[in-house]
Every structure is written in structure tokens, then in C-alpha cells.
């Protein structure tokens, strides 16, 4: 059984300026997107390295604004109404993937209009790179010591201090499980899948469906947010409620793409 290493969430300090690991993880995700996206653009009819850089600006705004607004609306609206200045303390965490997804979808729609192409041209190009950003985000959650799983006596558990119990307990490190499934595994699947021609929209649907499936599964090991608890039947969490439509819509989009879309994405 492992022991949580109690990592300082502040990576660097320059006088009054503090640089947090959580923010650096976002920068790492954006840097990967630019590097890998620029490489992929060499084999695309629609993309160039310059366009990848332009979209990165749109996408970063979508991720940060959508992720923050989504967390506030879906998970802790009452707190932020009472403490509105906490909205700006993003270095403490409090980002929701589902809100970030909506933000990125808006960014992709706007960028597709700018490129004068189908939104799926943008979404299919972006989809394989998103899991690496999710990986870095979950590592940031781990460093911050947040989003722990349930108490367990399993060998997969990690010893961590629980302030609500005022004692050290063993919990599932669900941040690392999400980093593995939603990050590494999903990236590998999409990377190999997008190497071959496929219908336009299929890669986007596969990402949405598999993310929803992986997230729905991990939620069984993860503790619900304390301000929400379980929503239904003593086991359904907000994360599962938001992921279920993703599973249905994502795989339905894959089926639709193969049945109806003759435009093949390279």
C-alpha cells in the first residue's frame, strides 16, 4: 500500500509570486497540443502549424472559462454565490471537465466558421490530443491532494490524511486512475484509430463516448463532492449523471458517421 507523498502545490516562488503545479499542468497540456498538433498538421489538407497555434488560443479560453463556469454551475453554485471572489482562485482547483467540453465545443464551432469547414473537421483533429491534457489535469489534481476515492483496504489504496476524519486512511487514488484511463488509454486508442481513414465525425464520437464510459466507471471508486453527495439511489454521482449522455451521444455519433457520412477524414 502506497503513502501519499504530500507534494507542495506551489512549484516555484519568486518573491510574492507563486507558480502552482496545477497551472503548470495546464501549460504542459497546451504545449503538447501545440507540438503534436503542429506535427499532425503536416499530413492535413485543412491544418497548418499556424492554424494550430490560432486554435490553441480559442481552445485554451474554452477550457478555462468553460471548466470554471461548469464547476460553479454543476458542483458548488451556493458557495460561489456566497463567496464570489473565489471564482478567480483557479489555482486551487475547481474545474469541471463537462463544462470545459462545452467551452471547447463553442471554441471549435467559432473556429470552424473562421476556417469555413464543418465543425467535425476541427473536432476530429482536436479529439486525439485532448486526453493528454486530461492526463496532466488529473496529475494536477493529485498534486493538490483533491478528488480522492473511497476508503479501501485494497492494495491499490494510498494512505492519505483525511481532515474530516482527523486520521490517516487508505483511499483509492482516483485521480491517477482517471489519468490512466481518460488520459493514457484514451490517447492510445484515438492515436491509432485516427491513423486510418474513417468517416468525418467518427473520431469525435469515439472520444466523447469512451470518455463518458471511463468517467462513469471511475465514479464508482471516487467520493462524490461533499456539497452534493449522491444524487440518486445512494450511488449516482453528478459526474455519472453528466457522463451518461456523453456515452449515448458519442457512440450514436460513431454509428451515424459510418452509416451516413461518406466524407472520409485522413
UniProtKB/Swiss-Prot annotation:
Pfam families registered for this protein in UniProt: LGT
Membrane topology field: Multi-pass membrane protein
InterPro entries in alphabetical order: Lgt (IPR001640)
Keyword annotations of the record: Cell inner membrane, Cell membrane, Membrane, Transferase, Transmembrane, Transmembrane helix
EC id: 2.5.1.145
UniProt GO cellular component terms: plasma membrane
Compartment(s) of residence: Cell inner membrane
Annotated pathway: Protein modification; lipoprotein biosynthesis (diacylglyceryl transfer)
Transmembrane segments: 14-34, 55-75, 91-111, 117-137, 172-192, 201-221, 235-255
Enzyme class: transferase
Annotated GO biological process: lipoprotein biosynthetic process
Residue sites binding a 1,2-diacyl-sn-glycero-3-phospho-(1'-sn-glycerol) per the record: 138
Gene Ontology terms, MF aspect: phosphatidylglycerol-prolipoprotein diacylglyceryl transferase activity
Family to which this protein belongs: Belongs to the Lgt family.
Xref: PANTHER family: PHOSPHATIDYLGLYCEROL--PROLIPOPROTEIN DIACYLGLYCERYL TRANSFERASE (PTHR30589:SF0), PROLIPOPROTEIN DIACYLGLYCERYL TRANSFERASE (PTHR30589)
Function statement: Catalyzes the transfer of the diacylglyceryl group from phosphatidylglycerol to the sulfhydryl group of the N-terminal cysteine of a prolipoprotein, the first step in the formation of mature lipoproteins.
Name assigned to this protein: Phosphatidylglycerol--prolipoprotein diacylglyceryl transferase
Organism of derivation: Hydrogenovibrio crunogenus (strain DSM 25203 / XCL-2) (Thiomicrospira crunogena)
Gene: lgt
